[in-house]
Amino acid sequence: MRVAPEFYEFLRNRINISDVVRQKVALTRKSGNYVGLCPFHQEKTPSFTVSNSKRFFYCFGCKAAGDVIKFTSNISGLSYNESAIKLAIDYGIEIPKLTAKQKEFYEESDEILNILELANKFFRTQLTPEILHYLHERGITEETVKEFSIGFAPKNNKFEKFFHDKNIDIIKLGKAGLIGKRENGEIYNLFSNRITIPIRNIYNKIVGFGGRVLGEGLPKYLNSPETTVFQKSETLYGEHKAISSSYKKNHSILVEGYFDVIALHQAGFSETVASLGTSVTENHLHKLWRAGDEIILCLDGDNAGIKASIRTINLALPLINSEKKISFIRLPSGLDPDDAVNKNGADFFAKLIDKRISLSEMIWHIEYSGKSFKTAEEKANLEKNLKNYCSKISDSDLKVSYYRFFKDQIWQNLVTTQKKATTKNSNLAPIISSHGYSELEILEHAFCALLVKFPIILEEKDIRDFILNLNFNNKSLEEFRNWYLNEIIDNNVEASEITAIVEKTSFFDIFLLLSKTDNLFLDISFNKNNIRLDLLWQWLHKKYYLINLQQEYAITINSTDNHDFEKVLLYKKEILKIANELQVLNESFINHTIT
């Protein structure tokens, strides 16, 4: 009885793999997964792990790995299809009958798979010493040639004769994606004079080929056309080998080419896969995330690689969250992954993995590095582009984190760096001379920004008194606060006249910094028409109170010989209370203002 591959996925989702495994293995819960003694080899220390969330098992000892169907197959000795049927019967799951059209489809698929397997056997027999020498020159060992079933498609008619002798006609070869048709109607071997690299699906079945031209010729690389069994948007080169390693290491490495995958596998990075001459798709990302929580992209550093990175970033942003991540390896100029590992060794590439950057860091690198931001228009365009990236993130918490990250980068790389040279003798110098800001200093800036942007808030006597009596750590800001209240607010200066007045004073740099539309000291945009000043003030006031509470708590702990535990407890209780209130305000205000 044949079942559709879609039913395999249904079983993986329906049946907890741990429920099936514990019928044969005593499992113990550990770090969200299960561990036990491997049923496939003798061991005294448990190295067999099972993950319900990833629907996967893996043995660190014998390397056995797979899904719930594969486990049943390994235990029972049944085929994969037979194991799926057994699981369905055991769990009372109805097996959908194939329609006549489905039967025809799967019969054709089986025939194509058989033809592709035959083609690969033929290509393997055509390897010559010259081709093996070429592969060895590329750093590929004879063992790796065998492991990846690398072959060669000759120019002569041996290919056609091979299949003719097996009574396989041109039509069937066409359905398998093995032949092409010239404009004059001539039929030819699609991979003629090319090194052949079989492409296998997750079940280790050959579904197509990649071909690398021998010598000069275009295109240099060629893939099988899409067929009944081969869809580029679904398939990743090397996935049949990589999935178990990805599960073990909790990450995958995604590269561009076949030889990148082969070189990295040979060097020990068996979690590597490649997209097949097409852009990365959502299907690719979800497939890799099922095996590991992080996808590490390692693309060429040229313009094409940067463009591919941008496409992948835009695709991934709506899909990522705090658990499912994307990161990037930045290769040295002129190197692709194949070169990186063959010329510099496995240790060099391992260090590149260790130095990988996050998706947010890659966005900043793409938008900032090597560009000029001298004009207001250039800076505005940078902020516009960064906000556009943030807007694509579906996870609200992550969206806020990205927004804050970019705000911090703008501050560190644009404001601080560009103003240092021109403000050594101004009141801004004490602000930007520090390498970082304490939370209290950031709040001082925020209070002053509020004063500049929303003077209407001073109509509330309590708020005016608070700001007026605030004792600033940064004395330059305190002087600005005093001057601004006395000269601008108390004299009811019109908004249109303020800049001209401040420009004549030593406070102009501070004024420019604080009056930016997008305030650098808060995760908000002041150009929002619907900004809630009441919530903003509550947030600032509570944050200020919390910081002072924490400082008093620290002083109490450090200065009391025999701690006044009752006092300490009161501080802890109040700190927790205010922190919770701030969290509520964060959700109702900060998230609201960046959407």
Curated annotation (Swiss-Prot):
InterPro entries: DNA_primase_core_N_sf (IPR037068), DNA_primase_DnaG (IPR006295), DNA_primase_Znf_CHC2 (IPR036977), DnaG_bac (IPR030846), DNAG_N (IPR013264), DnaG_primase (IPR050219), TOPRIM_DnaG_bac (IPR034151), TOPRIM_dom (IPR006171). A zinc finger (CHC2-type) spans 38-62. NCBIfam families: dnaG. CDD domains: TOPRIM_DnaG_primases. Contains an N-terminal zinc-binding domain, a central core domain that contains the primase activity, and a C-terminal DnaB-binding domain. Its cofactor is Zn(2+); Mg(2+). Mg(2+) 1 binds at E256, D300. Monomer. Interacts with DnaB. RNA polymerase that catalyzes the synthesis of short RNA molecules used as primers for DNA polymerase during DNA replication. PANTHER family: DNA PRIMASE (PTHR30313:SF2). It is an enzyme of class 2 (transferase). It catalyses: ssDNA + n NTP = ssDNA/pppN(pN)n-1 hybrid + (n-1) diphosphate. Binds 1 zinc ion per monomer. GO terms for cellular component: cytoplasm; DNA-directed RNA polymerase complex; primosome complex. Mg(2+) 2 binds at D300, D302. The gene is dnaG. Residues 250-332 form the Toprim domain. Belongs to the DnaG primase family. GO terms for biological process: DNA replication, synthesis of primer. Keywords: DNA replication, DNA-binding, DNA-directed RNA polymerase, Magnesium, Metal-binding, Nucleotidyltransferase, Primosome, Transcription, Transferase, Zinc, Zinc-finger. This is DNA primase. Its EC number is 2.7.7.101. GO terms for molecular function: DNA binding; DNA-directed RNA polymerase activity; zinc ion binding. The keyword DNA-binding applies. The keyword Metal-binding applies.
